[in-house]
Amino acid sequence: MDLLCWMAFGARVLAETAAVLGQAPEASKYTSIAAHLSDAQNLDRLHYDEDSGQYRDWGRHTEDVGLEWRVVQEEGQPSSRQELLRVRERGGREPVLQHVPHFGYVSLFPLMMRLVDPGSEALGEQLRQLQNPDHLWTDYGLRSLSRSSSLYNADNTEHDRPYWRSAIWINMNYLVLAALHHYGLAPGPHREAAARLHDRL
């Protein structure tokens, strides 16, 4: 989902750049691409989970995985070395196509890239969940992953700390802040809530 949002944003930037440079055919082409990628109905159809009120990635997912040490085999024999592997637990559920149930920065990309319709209930829900301290809100900015996520503060691998699984990133907070400013000026039922949230963040 984040890639779709970045591509929509990138196409808008290219369209604006081409227009400034007086390259009308390119501006028209990228405007068309941006409109296609920014289609709010398509975004909602693909990524909005009505039950949670969140935008979510879609893919093959299971919660039944973990990191496990295994002895490395060398020339068919166990060695003294071990490696950490991501494994599915025995008897655990196979990955299935579904919305990935982890609320974090990825969930905010439609908001950050200003793809959510200012009049939509989805925007109101994003604003409500954004300020929930059990999810992302802290006194120091928005954390990268909800505290309720099973992956919160969990290592990716032995040497890969959970940078995107709890930490507060100023660049992402800036994108959210800029989006809140945008929605705080846009006509719609959530204008005042977005402006208040902008001031708090």
Label every PLM stretch briefly.
Residues 2, 111, 190:
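Substrate-binding cleft of carbohydrate-active enzyme catalytic domains
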Residues 110-186:
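C-terminal substrate/ligand-recognition segments
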Residues 21-25, 184-185, 189:
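Short helix-adjacent coil turns
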Residues 1-9, 101-105, 164-178:
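Aromatic- and histidine-enriched alpha-helix N-cap/loop-to-helix transition segments
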Residues 8-118, 198-201:
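Catalytic cores of carbohydrate-active enzymes
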Residues 187-201:
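C-terminal structured "cap/appendage" subdomains that terminate the fold
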Residues 1-7, 126-130, 200:
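Short intrinsically disordered, low-complexity coil segments enriched in acidic
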